Amino acid sequence: MYICRQKATSYLSMPKYFYLLLSLVSLLLTSCAEQYNIDGKSSVSSLDGRMMYLRLTPDGFATVQTSTVCLDSCRMEHGRFSFDGDVDSVMMALLYSEGDCVMPVVLENGKLSVQVDNVEQRVSGGPLNDKLYKFFREKNRLDNEIWELHRKSMRMMYAGATPDDIDKAVGRHLAKLNRQSEDLDVQFVTENYDNPLGPGVFMLMCSQYPSPVMTTQITRIVQAAPLEFLSNPFVKNYLQQARK
């Protein structure tokens, strides 16, 4: 699942994609100013007293590893934190706990609820956040099933099973789950070409690679993409670098 690559901390327990450092993109959705109001809760005691930040990158080129702009900040107190403010348009930001990236948040009109605990991170209260975290839950389910098959194959190997035996036991199911996971990514991005979710999740996908690369999955996404999506600063820069 795609959220933020973490250091060895106890307050986020994620499948493999959640360990990836993510980039952040802000995208125009409407010409009207958007007002965000975020009420956050956390059951993780180690976060108490820490500063929480909403960060974004102004041009789509910077990454979490380099420079990001701090849009808003507050301190976690007794498991509660809050943000409120105005932005020119709906955009995707990243929630940080001091230097640690926690999760993406779509800044959209309305009262948003953010939950951070050791089991999951979620945002609710706005249509785009609801859609994003529904996708994350499905992605998480597939990742967990894939992880369990990998664990099963390791147990079989330690028990003396041959590679052929392991492949017969888990290979077909594993391949099916991997296809479903890839198809889920492609479907979500293509269905959201015209709003911040499409380029945002595309960026989360691309962040798993050490350098820009054109994969079959990325090709499937961009081959039918409209100009609006391809003109996004991150998407445009990534494709230019990957095609060199």
Locations of regions flagged by a protein language model:
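Bacterial Sec-dependent N-terminal signal peptides
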Residues: M1-S42
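Charged, long alpha-helical assembly modules
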Residues: T190-K244
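Positions in alpha-helical segments
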Residues: D130, R137, D183, G200-M203
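Surface-exposed, polar/charged faces of alpha-helical domains
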Residues: R155-R172, K176-R179, D183-G198, T216
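A non-transmembrane, solvent-exposed segment enriched in polar/low-complexity residues
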Residues: C32-A175
